[in-house]
Amino acid sequence: MRIPFRKSKDGIVLAVRVQPRSSKRGIEGVSGDTLKVKLTAPPHEGAANEQLIELLSEELGVRKGSIKIIKGSGSRNKVVEIKGLETL
């Protein structure tokens, strides 16, 4: 699967669409230039955002601290920056 991204000053930026409260957790694929992700956590008090960061950290092999939601923290559509990566 080719994940669309763009380069930023410190790493890369991804557009992500999350589906919280799913029966399973994982990367579901790509739709256009957006990564589709299913999460089991509810969208309450940042639980889904935390699980998204954890999942991306595991899948991409980067530290959780290098991943930041820069837009859409209260939305299903998010923009995520991953510092220290140049490509996927």
Regions found by a protein language model. Name each.
Residues 58-88:
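C-terminal structural segments of small proteins and small subunits
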